[in-house]
Every structure is written in C-alpha cells, then in structure tokens.
Design a protein with these regions (language model features):
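A structural feature that tracks compact, well-ordered secondary-structure segments
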Residues: 24, 42-44, 107-108, 137-140, ...
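Solvent-exposed, acidic/flexible segments
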Residues: 14-21, 98, 102, 127-134
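Acidic helix-start/capping segments at beta-turn-to-alpha-helix junctions
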Residues: 41-51, 155-164
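Surface-exposed, charged secondary-structure patches
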Residues: 45-103, 166-218
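Sec-dependent signal peptide cleavage junction
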Residues: 1-46
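Surface-exposed beta-loop interaction hotspot
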Residues: 115-151, 155-170
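Short loop/beta submotifs within extracellular cysteine-rich repeat domains
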Residues: 33-37, 116-117, 148-151, 231-233
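Short beta-strand edge/turn micro-motifs at domain boundaries
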Residues: 99-129, 217-241
Length: 241
C-alpha cells in the first residue's frame, strides 16, 4: 500500500443496525463514539442562506429524540406508513419542527456502502400558505383543551387492541369526554419527524401524526383531515402493548 492510501480515514463499516434506519438512528443518538464515526466532518450547516462548517472538535453529541419517552412521525396518507420498516432506503431526513418559532431543523442521512452517514444539517422557517397550517393548528390543538374540544369529530372513530385477544383489533367510537380520558399527552413545543420518502405536502387535505414509544410499547396514531378549511381529528388509534 502507498503512504497516500494510509492517510485516508477508514470508511465506516456497516453494522447490523444499519439495515433498519430506525435501529441505526437510535444507536447513533445514544452512542457518542458511533455518532462521531457517522458524521461527515466538516459538516455543512445551513441556516437560511448562510452556510458554516462544523469541525469535529466543535461537535457536541446530539441525543435527537432519545431522551424523550416517545417520538412523532408525520404522514399525509396511510399507505406511506409502510415506508417505516423499508430496508432498501438510501436517503432519510430526521426533522425537528419547532412549533413556537416555526422553524424546521433537518438532518440529512445517506446510506453509503451500507452505512448511514449524516451529511448536512439545515435550519429554515416553516413555509406559510393560505390554508390553516397543520403545525400552527397542532400547536393550538395540543396546548388548548377548549380549542381541542372544538376540533375533535363526534363521534370519534377509535381503533384499539382487543383486551381479550392480542391479535385482533376493536373498531368503535368515542365521545368527547372519552377522548379526553384516553388521549395521550401531546407535544406542545416541538415535533420530530423521520422522512423516509413520504410526502409532506403543506396543502394535503389529510395528516397523520404517529406517536411511537422509545423502549416501551407505546403506539398512538392521530388522523386529521381538513374540513371547510379547518383541521379536525377524525380517528384515534391506540395499539400500545
């Protein structure tokens, strides 16, 4: 081997966790040594139109959402939820949507020779348009129970695991009081999202917010649709284990 070749840093070797992006991202967020191996330094950091580079010595470990009990995912339609376990993906973005400041922080991951690598971070404002914006709506919905009660369809479709049979699903409905009794704690300051390739169109008439437990069996899905220009919760699914 020539001297020149030996100076090149070794390429990260893929591990078993790289097969599924969800497994990888959990390891990436919880293991500092792995994280440093999987960030492409100097890392381009875009803030609006400004670009800076983060050098390895200035990198601070990023827990992403692993310090929370759950994370959230956003979809426009149900069939896109099948992308979650897809092992053929090569490009995924992890997003933080900061509800109050209306900013989105996006982490760009690429799978290179089997190993997931963070290639860039981008911070930008949420785009505004004429329709009631889902992020803005959700910030009210999560924080204000009076507003929430006006935006829950009655009766609310409810899907849950059958308490007598783990493998079957019960489909029933809830009234408003039952929704308030069964609903999960909703995030008020920021939403996470993993973009596996699903569309997230601001003009979509439907939105799905999935809440997924980290290291526990929690799983809730909220289904929203725009009715006469206003967002409304029309279906709630609780299949927690």
């Amino acid at each position: 081997r020539s001297i020149h070749q030996e100076e090149l840093p070794e390429e990260p070797k893929p591990t078993e966790a790289d097969e599924s992006f969800d497994d990888f991202i959990y390891n990436f967020a919880s293991d500092d040594a792995l994280q440093r191996q999987r960030v492409k330094f100097p890392l381009p950091y875009y803030k609006g139109d400004e670009k800076t580079n983060i050098e390895e010595r200035n990198w601070k470990h990023d827990d992403l959402f692993t310090k929370q009990h759950y994370y959230t995912l956003l979809f426009d339609k149900e069939e896109d939820m099948d992308l979650v376990g897809d092992t053929s993906l090569t490009s995924v973005q992890v997003e933080w949507i900061f509800v109050k400041t209306r900013m989105v922080k996006k982490y760009y991951f690429e799978r290179i020779k089997g190993a997931w690598i963070l290639e860039a971070i981008n911070l930008r404002p949420v785009e505004r348009n004429e329709n009631e914006d889902f992020v803005e709506f959700f910030s009210h919905f999560a924080a204000d129970s009076l507003f929430q009660s006006r935006r829950v369809q009655e009766p609310l479709a409810f899907v849950t695991s059958d308490p007598d049979d783990d493998f079957s699903i019960l489909e029933t409905s809830l009234d408003l009081n039952q929704w308030f009794a069964f609903k999960p704690a909703l995030p008020t300051d920021r939403l996470s999202n993993i973009n596996y390739g699903q569309r997230n169109d601001d003009n979509s008439p439907t939105k799905i917010l999935a809440l997924k437990g980290i290291g526990n069996g929690f799983s809730n899905i909220l289904y929203f649709r725009r009715k006469a220009g206003e967002w409304q919760l029309y279906k709630f699914e609780d299949t927690s284990i």
